[in-house]
């Protein structure tokens, strides 16, 4: 089991959530791939979109419904600074995850996070579990709570 997957499992256990982490043979690098593999609507997939703060260089995480896009201006306003593209090295260094497997929890460093209200419309949502092939399902309020994210409007 990878270190990334272990960190997510530990974060779930520490939060008292008894959820199953599933390995998807087809991979879940995109929201469409994940929805197909999980047998759910695309908006039930939690996309982890990371930007880099231009002022401090720190990662800012936007947890959005799979069919939504992050509006850069709204995201920057929420973050209180201009946001730029986060490269794979920054994402790996600050979260410990590779692109395509960024979980909403279990990051190497604390991360400021925002949560798409669209995700609250479902009984269950699916998120990456630390690798591009692993996912877990939980209730939206559970992921919101354990991620420490703030519900906010940042989509286009």
How would you name each of these model-derived features?
Residues 1-156:
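Extended, low-hydrophobicity, polar/charged segments
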